[in-house]
Design a protein with these regions (language model features):
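A cross-kingdom feature marking charged/low-complexity
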Residues: 38, 42-64
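Short, well-ordered alpha-helical segments
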Residues: 2-35
Length: 64
């Protein structure tokens, strides 16, 4: 079995968990058999002292 790792970014206005899920949902439209996700880091976009956007950088493992 061969495993490939793909790096991607998920975004959400609701939170980091939703940002991760957004990335997995979007990737699963084109990538079959996702077997795991490593969150590399989280970042946020801030406006007027408030977080308005969340980003999660991921490494996704999937079967090839």
């Amino acid at each position: 079995m061969h495993i490939k790792v793909t790096e991607l970014v998920g975004e959400s206005s609701a939170g980091w968990k939703d940002a991760v899920q957004s990335a997995v949902t979007e990737a699963s439209r084109n990538i079959n058999e996702i077997v795991g996700v490593e969150v590399v880091n989280f970042t946020a976009h801030v406006e007027n002292g408030r977080i308005v956007g969340y980003k999660a950088n991921l490494k996704m493992a999937h079967k090839q």
